[in-house]
């Protein structure tokens, strides 16, 4: 009584430090909370037979991997480190995992050849009998270091020789069906358990090489944005490929050739060589150490040996560091200032565009608390005029965080009038203006009418005075009595015209 049942999930949680160390050795990070969520919920909801308590069955792990590595928007790149660590615990189990491993399946017997080894030519056949010739033995990859890169259109992996005996004349059954793509497509024989990695264990316990296919590179390039547009997304994709596929040096060059431009590749390689560690673990400046650890030409690394695999592991880590370093852009604040809030854009959408501009045109992280002041100023001064004016008048603005300003901006935005309300307000304002103008015009007209009325009154008084009748002996010109107007001394008189008298004698 009181005993608890140990499950694969609880077992990994009890040995969490070792699980994290295992993931760290593979170049990834895992977190306990997400580990539990994926095992108990996310992978169960994929409907591939994953139990809530977890499992170390490679069949279940492979089914989950097919969902995670699905191309395009159907995949789950964020879950790659977790399923990779699960597979690592199942394929290379520590001592505390071995008792919980499922029993191994009996090996599938190879089918008998359809035709026995002929000692003499067949007497009857549907096809003409061709003379047999011993085929040349395929070389073990990688070939001569001076040879060119592997052909991208190669779909069949280069096999490793299984022995020195002659090959059977009948059709042979491969030990593992070749992959059509590096995205873990469904295999024809689900009973055979194999790991879809470029370097995996072959029939003779030797690593077997699986090159990239043209369809893989095409899908990765077409379903992801360019590095110049979204370096974070493409870096995450390449990281998942490096972790899960464990590519060789040639594979890495093909990957960079397909996904990056020439200028971008140069930046990535330059940043990666800056991160080559020295003996003290810090980046070194010694050219020989840099060329040995991160070579620019094909190295003589044999992935079949532990030393070669260690070189490749360090090379992939440095390549990933170079991608992250090249993703940092030069500062271009002019592009950030061009991001302004639209007339009908919400403050939240504008803030997201502003942060994206900081990520794209500056090396700064807008989520970094040290950059909060710059983001706040850009958010205030690049908002729409009505929001900007009200945000600037807030009391204690220096104590506001970006979240507080976003809330205030949302309040201002939500209180905005609708187009109908704005039209009604403008109509009322125009009506009030017209009423005021009409009132002023009425006053002006009343003043003019009053002035005209007073003038008419004065003129009427003067007219009445001029119509007073004159006296009998009163002058009509000077209004004095004693004479008439024709005899008025004050009246100007016309001078008589000078007449020239002509003498009759003249």
UniProtKB/Swiss-Prot annotation:
Short motif LYPX(n)L motif, span: 126-130
UniProt zinc finger (CCHC-type) residues: 473-490
Low complexity: compositionally biased ranges: 120-132
Compositionally biased intervals (Polar residues): 497-506
Keyword Nuclease (UniProt): no
Modification after translation (UniProt): RNA-binding phosphoprotein p12 is phosphorylated on serine residues.
GO terms under cellular component: host cell late endosome membrane; host cell plasma membrane; host multivesicular body; membrane; viral nucleocapsid
Lipidation (N-myristoyl glycine): 2
Annotated spans, Disordered: 97-208, 417-440, 486-506
Record's compositionally biased regions (Pro residues): 100-119, 136-146, 156-171
Matches recorded under SUPFAM superfamilies: Retroviral matrix proteins, Retrovirus capsid protein, N-terminal core domain, Retrovirus zinc finger-like domains
Superkingdom per UniProt: Viruses
Entry protein name: Gag polyprotein
Upper lineage: Viruses, Riboviria, Pararnavirae, Artverviricota, Revtraviricetes
């Amino acid at each position: 009584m009181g005993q608890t049942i140990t499950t694969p999930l609880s077992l990994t949680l009890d040995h969490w430090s070792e699980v994290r160390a295992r993931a760290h050795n593979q170049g990834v990070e895992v977190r306990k909370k997400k580990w539990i969520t994926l095992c108990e919920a996310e992978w169960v909801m994929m409907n591939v037979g994953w139990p809530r308590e977890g499992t170390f069955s490679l069949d279940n792990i492979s089914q989950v991997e097919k969902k995670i590595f699905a191309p395009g928007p159907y995949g789950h790149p964020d879950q790659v480190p977790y399923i990779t660590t699960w597979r690592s615990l199942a394929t290379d189990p520590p001592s505390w995992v071995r008792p919980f491993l499922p029993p191994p399946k009996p090996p599938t017997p190879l089918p008998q050849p359809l035709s026995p080894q002929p000692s003499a030519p067949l007497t009857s056949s549907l096809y003409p009998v061709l003379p047999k010739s011993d085929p040349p033995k395929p070389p073990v990859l990688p070939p001569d270091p001076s040879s060119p890169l592997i052909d991208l259109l190669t779909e069949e992996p280069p096999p490793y020789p299984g022995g020195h005996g002659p090959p059977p004349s009948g059709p042979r059954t491969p030990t593992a069906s070749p992959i059509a793509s590096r995205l873990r497509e469904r295999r024809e024989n689900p009973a055979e358990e194999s790991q879809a990695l470029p370097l995996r264990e072959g029939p003779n316990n030797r690593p077997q090489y699986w090159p990239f296919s043209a369809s893989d590179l095409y899908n990765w390039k077409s379903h992801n944005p360019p590095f110049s547009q979204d370096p974070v997304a493409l870096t995450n994709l390449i990281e998942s490929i490096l972790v899960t596929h464990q590519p060789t040096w040639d594979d890495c060059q093909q990957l960079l050739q397909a996904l990056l431009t020439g200028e971008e590749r140069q930046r990535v390689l330059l940043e990666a060589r800056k991160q080559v560690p020295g003996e003290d673990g810090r980046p070194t400046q010694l050219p020989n150490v840099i060329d040995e650890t991160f070579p620019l030409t094909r190295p003589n690394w044999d992935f079949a040996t532990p030393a070669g695999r260690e070189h490749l592991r360090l090379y992939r880590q440095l390549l990933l560091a170079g991608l992250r370093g090249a993703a940092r852009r030069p500062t271009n604040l002019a592009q950030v200032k061009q991001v302004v809030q639209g007339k009908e854009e919400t403050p939240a959408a504008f803030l997201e565009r502003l942060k994206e501009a900081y990520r794209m045109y500056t090396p700064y992280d807008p989520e970094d608390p040290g950059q909060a002041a710059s983001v706040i100023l850009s958010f205030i001064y690049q908002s729409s005029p009505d929001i900007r004016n009200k945000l600037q008048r807030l009391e204690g603005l220096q104590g506001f965080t970006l979240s507080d300003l976003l809330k205030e901006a949302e309040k201002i935005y939500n209180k905005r009038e609708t187009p109908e309300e704005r039209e009604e307000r403008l109509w009322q304002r125009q009506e009030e203006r017209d009423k005021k103008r009409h009132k002023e015009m009425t006053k002006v007209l009343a003043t003019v009418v009053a002035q005209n009325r007073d003038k008419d009154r004065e003129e009427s008084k003067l007219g009445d005075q001029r119509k007073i009748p004159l006296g009998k002996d009163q002058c009509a010109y000077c209004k004095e009595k004693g004479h008439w107007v024709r005899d008025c001394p004050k009246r100007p008189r016309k001078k008589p015209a000078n007449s020239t008298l002509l003498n009759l004698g003249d």
